[in-house]
Amino acid sequence: YFGCICQRQAHCYYPPFLWENDRRIYLDNELLPPGTPLDEGADPLDPHSYDKYTQQTYSPDIMYDRVLRFVNENRERPFFLMWTTPIPHSPMQAPDEMVQYYVEKFGDEAPIEGKGYFPSRWPHATYAAMITYFDRQVGGLVAELKRLGIWDDTIIVVTSDNGPASNSCSSTEWFQSAHPFRSGKGWGKSSLREGGIRMPFIVAWGDRIDRPHVNGHVGYFPDVMPTLCDIAGVETPPTDGISLWPTIRGKERRQQEHDYLYWEFPGGKGWVAVRWGDWKGLLRKVKEGNTQLELYDVRHDLLEEHDVAADHPDVVARMWEFIRASHTEPENPLFKMEIPEV
Protein backbone atom coordinates (compact mmCIF):
# COMPACT_ATOMS: atom_id res chain seq x y z
CA TYR A 1 0.00 0.00 0.00
CA PHE A 2 1.12 3.54 -0.71
CA GLY A 3 -0.88 6.73 -0.10
CA CYS A 4 -2.98 8.34 2.62
CA ILE A 5 -4.68 6.47 5.44
CA CYS A 6 -6.33 9.50 7.01
CA GLN A 7 -9.42 11.21 5.58
CA ARG A 8 -8.26 14.56 6.93
CA GLN A 9 -4.74 14.21 5.53
CA ALA A 10 -6.18 13.20 2.16
CA HIS A 11 -7.79 16.64 1.86
CA CYS A 12 -4.43 18.21 1.05
CA TYR A 13 -2.36 17.55 -2.08
CA TYR A 14 0.83 18.75 -0.38
CA PRO A 15 0.90 16.67 2.84
CA PRO A 16 4.05 16.37 4.98
CA PHE A 17 4.11 12.59 4.50
CA LEU A 18 2.43 9.59 2.87
CA TRP A 19 2.26 6.00 4.05
CA GLU A 20 4.05 3.01 2.55
CA ASN A 21 2.40 0.07 4.28
CA ASP A 22 3.23 0.74 7.95
CA ARG A 23 5.88 3.47 7.64
CA ARG A 24 5.79 7.14 6.83
CA ILE A 25 7.43 8.52 3.70
CA TYR A 26 8.19 12.16 4.43
CA LEU A 27 7.74 14.78 1.71
CA ASP A 28 9.22 18.24 1.33
CA ASN A 29 6.04 19.95 2.53
CA GLU A 30 4.97 21.75 5.68
CA LEU A 31 1.82 20.78 7.57
CA LEU A 32 -1.12 22.91 6.50
CA PRO A 33 -4.36 21.84 8.20
CA PRO A 34 -7.24 21.28 5.75
CA GLY A 35 -9.55 24.27 5.61
CA THR A 36 -6.83 26.78 6.45
CA PRO A 37 -8.15 30.18 5.26
CA LEU A 38 -6.27 33.04 3.68
CA ASP A 39 -4.13 35.09 6.03
CA GLU A 40 -6.02 37.86 7.77
CA GLY A 41 -6.07 40.95 5.59
CA ALA A 42 -4.87 39.10 2.48
CA ASP A 43 -6.23 40.31 -0.85
CA PRO A 44 -8.33 37.46 -2.32
CA LEU A 45 -7.64 38.78 -5.85
CA ASP A 46 -3.86 38.67 -5.43
CA PRO A 47 -2.46 35.31 -6.62
CA HIS A 48 0.37 35.57 -4.09
CA SER A 49 -2.17 35.41 -1.26
CA TYR A 50 -2.48 31.72 -2.16
CA ASP A 51 1.23 30.86 -2.28
CA LYS A 52 1.12 28.77 0.90
CA TYR A 53 -1.31 26.31 -0.70
CA THR A 54 1.24 25.27 -3.35
CA GLN A 55 4.31 23.70 -1.78
CA GLN A 56 7.17 21.51 -3.04
CA THR A 57 5.98 17.93 -3.54
CA TYR A 58 2.63 17.26 -5.22
CA SER A 59 1.49 13.96 -3.70
CA PRO A 60 -0.15 12.60 -6.92
CA ASP A 61 3.33 12.71 -8.49
CA ILE A 62 4.73 10.44 -5.78
CA MET A 63 1.76 8.08 -6.06
CA TYR A 64 2.19 7.94 -9.84
CA ASP A 65 5.90 7.16 -9.48
CA ARG A 66 5.00 4.23 -7.22
CA VAL A 67 2.48 3.02 -9.81
CA LEU A 68 5.22 2.91 -12.46
CA ARG A 69 7.63 1.27 -10.02
CA PHE A 70 5.10 -1.43 -9.15
CA VAL A 71 4.46 -2.19 -12.82
CA ASN A 72 8.17 -2.44 -13.55
CA GLU A 73 8.88 -4.65 -10.54
CA ASN A 74 6.07 -7.06 -11.48
CA ARG A 75 6.31 -7.01 -15.27
CA GLU A 76 7.41 -10.66 -15.42
CA ARG A 77 4.41 -12.00 -13.48
CA PRO A 78 0.65 -11.41 -13.18
CA PHE A 79 -0.23 -8.44 -11.00
CA PHE A 80 -3.22 -6.50 -9.70
CA LEU A 81 -2.89 -2.78 -9.07
CA MET A 82 -5.57 -0.50 -7.63
CA TRP A 83 -4.59 3.11 -8.21
CA THR A 84 -7.00 5.34 -6.28
CA THR A 85 -5.72 8.77 -7.20
CA PRO A 86 -7.21 11.62 -5.15
CA ILE A 87 -7.45 13.75 -8.33
CA PRO A 88 -9.76 15.70 -8.87
CA HIS A 89 -11.31 15.65 -5.39
CA SER A 90 -11.41 18.92 -3.45
CA PRO A 91 -9.44 20.93 -2.47
CA MET A 92 -8.47 22.62 -5.72
CA GLN A 93 -4.68 22.23 -5.85
CA ALA A 94 -2.44 21.64 -8.87
CA PRO A 95 1.05 22.66 -10.04
CA ASP A 96 1.01 26.31 -11.07
CA GLU A 97 2.31 25.77 -14.62
CA MET A 98 -0.72 23.71 -15.59
CA VAL A 99 -3.14 26.00 -13.75
CA GLN A 100 -1.81 29.00 -15.67
CA TYR A 101 -2.40 27.19 -18.96
CA TYR A 102 -6.12 27.13 -18.17
CA VAL A 103 -6.13 30.64 -16.73
CA GLU A 104 -5.08 31.79 -20.20
CA LYS A 105 -7.81 29.68 -21.81
CA PHE A 106 -10.65 30.59 -19.43
CA GLY A 107 -9.68 34.14 -18.53
CA ASP A 108 -10.05 35.70 -15.10
CA GLU A 109 -12.59 34.30 -12.65
CA ALA A 110 -13.80 34.85 -9.12
CA PRO A 111 -11.86 33.14 -6.33
CA ILE A 112 -13.51 30.80 -3.84
CA GLU A 113 -13.19 30.70 -0.07
CA GLY A 114 -13.06 26.91 -0.01
CA LYS A 115 -16.01 26.12 2.28
CA GLY A 116 -14.08 23.76 4.54
CA TYR A 117 -11.35 23.13 1.98
CA PHE A 118 -8.54 25.45 0.86
CA PRO A 119 -9.43 28.65 -0.99
CA SER A 120 -8.47 28.95 -4.65
CA ARG A 121 -7.72 31.97 -6.80
CA TRP A 122 -8.70 30.19 -10.02
CA PRO A 123 -11.04 27.30 -9.16
CA HIS A 124 -12.18 26.53 -12.73
CA ALA A 125 -8.65 26.60 -14.10
CA THR A 126 -7.35 24.49 -11.24
CA TYR A 127 -10.06 21.86 -11.63
CA ALA A 128 -9.33 21.61 -15.36
CA ALA A 129 -5.62 21.36 -14.59
CA MET A 130 -6.24 18.47 -12.19
CA ILE A 131 -8.29 16.56 -14.77
CA THR A 132 -5.57 17.10 -17.39
CA TYR A 133 -2.90 16.04 -14.91
CA PHE A 134 -4.61 12.71 -14.27
CA ASP A 135 -5.27 12.21 -17.99
CA ARG A 136 -1.56 12.64 -18.72
CA GLN A 137 -0.65 10.23 -15.95
CA VAL A 138 -2.95 7.57 -17.41
CA GLY A 139 -1.35 8.19 -20.79
CA GLY A 140 2.07 7.80 -19.21
CA LEU A 141 1.06 4.48 -17.66
CA VAL A 142 -0.19 3.22 -21.02
CA ALA A 143 3.10 4.27 -22.64
CA GLU A 144 5.07 2.44 -19.95
CA LEU A 145 3.04 -0.75 -20.40
CA LYS A 146 3.75 -0.60 -24.13
CA ARG A 147 7.45 0.03 -23.53
CA LEU A 148 7.61 -3.02 -21.26
CA GLY A 149 5.81 -5.14 -23.86
CA ILE A 150 2.87 -6.01 -21.59
CA TRP A 151 0.21 -3.66 -22.96
CA ASP A 152 -1.68 -6.45 -24.74
CA ASP A 153 -1.67 -8.52 -21.54
CA THR A 154 -2.91 -5.78 -19.21
CA ILE A 155 -6.52 -4.86 -18.49
CA ILE A 156 -7.11 -1.23 -17.48
CA VAL A 157 -10.34 -0.03 -15.87
CA VAL A 158 -10.95 3.68 -15.28
CA THR A 159 -14.00 4.67 -13.28
CA SER A 160 -15.15 6.81 -10.35
CA ASP A 161 -16.56 6.14 -6.91
CA ASN A 162 -19.50 8.53 -7.29
CA GLY A 163 -20.92 11.39 -9.29
CA PRO A 164 -19.78 15.02 -9.10
CA ALA A 165 -19.77 16.91 -5.81
CA SER A 166 -22.11 19.84 -5.32
CA ASN A 167 -19.72 22.10 -3.39
CA SER A 168 -18.41 25.23 -5.07
CA CYS A 169 -14.78 24.06 -5.07
CA SER A 170 -14.87 21.95 -8.23
CA SER A 171 -17.57 23.97 -10.03
CA THR A 172 -19.17 20.85 -11.44
CA GLU A 173 -22.25 22.74 -12.58
CA TRP A 174 -20.07 25.23 -14.49
CA PHE A 175 -18.31 22.31 -16.20
CA GLN A 176 -21.57 20.33 -16.57
CA SER A 177 -19.65 17.39 -15.10
CA ALA A 178 -22.78 15.30 -14.63
CA HIS A 179 -24.37 16.16 -17.98
CA PRO A 180 -27.18 15.50 -18.68
CA PHE A 181 -27.85 15.01 -14.97
CA ARG A 182 -28.01 17.64 -12.27
CA SER A 183 -25.16 17.76 -9.77
CA GLY A 184 -26.43 20.28 -7.24
CA LYS A 185 -27.01 19.38 -3.60
CA GLY A 186 -29.13 16.23 -3.38
CA TRP A 187 -28.57 15.32 -7.02
CA GLY A 188 -24.88 14.39 -7.38
CA LYS A 189 -22.39 12.92 -4.94
CA SER A 190 -23.89 11.73 -1.65
CA SER A 191 -27.20 11.01 -3.33
CA LEU A 192 -28.63 7.96 -5.08
CA ARG A 193 -29.99 10.04 -7.94
CA GLU A 194 -28.65 9.11 -11.38
CA GLY A 195 -26.22 12.01 -11.09
CA GLY A 196 -24.79 10.42 -7.96
CA ILE A 197 -24.47 6.78 -9.01
CA ARG A 198 -24.18 6.78 -12.82
CA MET A 199 -20.60 7.23 -14.02
CA PRO A 200 -18.24 6.16 -16.81
CA PHE A 201 -16.71 2.69 -16.71
CA ILE A 202 -13.92 2.57 -19.28
CA VAL A 203 -12.14 -0.71 -20.06
CA ALA A 204 -9.07 -1.19 -22.25
CA TRP A 205 -7.15 -4.40 -22.97
CA GLY A 206 -4.68 -3.85 -25.77
CA ASP A 207 -6.05 -5.38 -28.98
CA ARG A 208 -8.07 -8.06 -27.21
CA ILE A 209 -11.35 -6.18 -27.10
CA ASP A 210 -12.88 -6.67 -30.54
CA ARG A 211 -13.71 -3.06 -31.29
CA PRO A 212 -14.09 0.24 -29.44
CA HIS A 213 -17.73 0.64 -28.52
CA VAL A 214 -20.12 2.25 -26.06
CA ASN A 215 -22.62 0.07 -24.23
CA GLY A 216 -25.58 1.02 -22.05
CA HIS A 217 -25.58 -2.15 -19.95
CA VAL A 218 -26.59 -1.40 -16.36
CA GLY A 219 -24.19 -2.81 -13.79
CA TYR A 220 -22.59 -1.73 -10.53
CA PHE A 221 -19.37 -2.11 -8.58
CA PRO A 222 -20.07 -5.61 -7.20
CA ASP A 223 -19.74 -6.72 -10.84
CA VAL A 224 -16.06 -5.73 -11.03
CA MET A 225 -14.54 -8.64 -9.11
CA PRO A 226 -16.54 -11.34 -10.95
CA THR A 227 -15.56 -9.68 -14.23
CA LEU A 228 -11.84 -9.70 -13.47
CA CYS A 229 -12.02 -13.24 -12.10
CA ASP A 230 -13.84 -14.36 -15.24
CA ILE A 231 -11.18 -12.85 -17.48
CA ALA A 232 -8.38 -14.37 -15.40
CA GLY A 233 -10.03 -17.79 -15.29
CA VAL A 234 -10.32 -17.68 -11.50
CA GLU A 235 -13.32 -19.04 -9.61
CA THR A 236 -15.38 -16.17 -8.23
CA PRO A 237 -16.24 -16.15 -4.51
CA PRO A 238 -19.96 -15.77 -3.73
CA THR A 239 -20.97 -12.14 -4.26
CA ASP A 240 -23.92 -10.14 -5.57
CA GLY A 241 -21.97 -9.37 -8.74
CA ILE A 242 -22.19 -10.73 -12.28
CA SER A 243 -19.31 -10.82 -14.78
CA LEU A 244 -19.47 -8.06 -17.39
CA TRP A 245 -16.96 -9.79 -19.65
CA PRO A 246 -19.51 -10.68 -22.38
CA THR A 247 -20.54 -7.03 -22.65
CA ILE A 248 -16.96 -5.75 -22.61
CA ARG A 249 -15.97 -7.95 -25.55
CA GLY A 250 -19.08 -7.06 -27.54
CA LYS A 251 -21.05 -10.27 -26.87
CA GLU A 252 -24.07 -8.55 -25.33
CA ARG A 253 -26.44 -11.40 -26.14
CA ARG A 254 -24.47 -13.65 -23.80
CA GLN A 255 -24.62 -11.16 -20.93
CA GLN A 256 -26.38 -12.36 -17.79
CA GLU A 257 -28.63 -9.70 -16.29
CA HIS A 258 -29.32 -8.80 -12.67
CA ASP A 259 -32.86 -9.38 -11.46
CA TYR A 260 -32.51 -5.96 -9.83
CA LEU A 261 -29.82 -3.67 -8.42
CA TYR A 262 -29.83 -2.31 -4.88
CA TRP A 263 -28.03 0.62 -3.25
CA GLU A 264 -27.93 2.07 0.26
CA PHE A 265 -26.26 5.28 1.40
CA PRO A 266 -26.45 5.98 5.15
CA GLY A 267 -24.85 9.42 4.90
CA GLY A 268 -26.93 12.52 5.57
CA LYS A 269 -30.57 11.59 6.08
CA GLY A 270 -30.16 8.20 4.41
CA TRP A 271 -30.96 6.91 0.93
CA VAL A 272 -32.12 3.64 -0.64
CA ALA A 273 -32.47 2.95 -4.37
CA VAL A 274 -33.57 -0.03 -6.46
CA ARG A 275 -33.22 -0.49 -10.21
CA TRP A 276 -35.59 -3.07 -11.70
CA GLY A 277 -35.55 -3.05 -15.47
CA ASP A 278 -36.55 0.46 -16.54
CA TRP A 279 -38.03 1.21 -13.11
CA LYS A 280 -36.11 2.99 -10.39
CA GLY A 281 -37.38 3.20 -6.84
CA LEU A 282 -35.92 5.92 -4.63
CA LEU A 283 -36.39 6.33 -0.90
CA ARG A 284 -35.01 9.49 0.70
CA LYS A 285 -34.80 10.61 4.34
CA VAL A 286 -34.70 7.01 5.51
CA LYS A 287 -33.31 7.97 8.92
CA GLU A 288 -36.34 10.19 9.49
CA GLY A 289 -38.67 7.24 8.94
CA ASN A 290 -39.89 8.36 5.52
CA THR A 291 -41.86 5.64 3.70
CA GLN A 292 -42.86 7.62 0.58
CA LEU A 293 -40.98 5.71 -2.09
CA GLU A 294 -40.57 7.63 -5.33
CA LEU A 295 -40.84 5.78 -8.64
CA TYR A 296 -39.30 6.78 -11.96
CA ASP A 297 -39.40 5.26 -15.43
CA VAL A 298 -35.76 5.98 -16.28
CA ARG A 299 -36.17 4.84 -19.86
CA HIS A 300 -38.41 7.83 -20.54
CA ASP A 301 -37.51 10.00 -17.53
CA LEU A 302 -33.76 9.68 -17.13
CA LEU A 303 -33.53 12.95 -15.21
CA GLU A 304 -35.98 11.71 -12.54
CA GLU A 305 -38.37 14.61 -12.90
CA HIS A 306 -41.71 12.77 -12.76
CA ASP A 307 -42.56 10.59 -9.75
CA VAL A 308 -45.15 8.05 -10.96
CA ALA A 309 -45.44 6.03 -7.74
CA ALA A 310 -49.14 6.86 -7.36
CA ASP A 311 -49.85 5.40 -10.81
CA HIS A 312 -48.06 2.09 -10.22
CA PRO A 313 -48.73 0.77 -6.69
CA ASP A 314 -47.90 -2.77 -7.83
CA VAL A 315 -44.38 -1.71 -8.87
CA VAL A 316 -43.93 0.21 -5.61
CA ALA A 317 -44.92 -2.90 -3.65
CA ARG A 318 -42.37 -4.94 -5.57
CA MET A 319 -39.69 -2.35 -4.82
CA TRP A 320 -40.37 -2.73 -1.11
CA GLU A 321 -39.97 -6.50 -1.49
CA PHE A 322 -36.55 -5.95 -3.03
CA ILE A 323 -35.57 -3.57 -0.23
CA ARG A 324 -36.61 -6.05 2.47
CA ALA A 325 -34.74 -8.87 0.76
CA SER A 326 -31.55 -6.85 0.25
CA HIS A 327 -31.09 -4.83 3.44
CA THR A 328 -28.63 -6.40 5.89
CA GLU A 329 -27.26 -5.16 9.19
CA PRO A 330 -23.77 -3.67 8.62
CA GLU A 331 -20.86 -4.75 10.79
CA ASN A 332 -19.74 -1.14 11.19
CA PRO A 333 -22.24 0.74 13.41
CA LEU A 334 -21.40 3.98 11.59
CA PHE A 335 -23.23 2.59 8.54
CA LYS A 336 -26.28 1.44 10.45
CA MET A 337 -29.59 2.57 8.98
CA GLU A 338 -32.98 1.20 9.92
CA ILE A 339 -35.42 0.60 7.08
CA PRO A 340 -38.86 1.92 8.11
CA GLU A 341 -41.88 -0.36 8.22
CA VAL A 342 -44.67 0.14 5.70
Regions found by a protein language model. Give the residues of each.
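C-terminal cap/loop subdomain of S1 sulfatases and analogous C-terminal strand-loop tails that border
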Residues: 1-11, 164-194, 204, 208-213, ...
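Aromatic- and acidic-residue-enriched segments that line the glycan-binding/catalytic groove
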Residues: 18-20, 87-111, 169-180
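Active-site rim elements
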Residues: 50-57, 117-129, 186-192, 208-219, ...
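A structural signal for well-ordered alpha-helical segments within the folded catalytic domains
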Residues: 58-65, 125, 132-139, 197, ...
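Metal-dependent active-site segment of extracytoplasmic phospho-/sulfohydrolases and closely related
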Residues: 82-85, 130-171
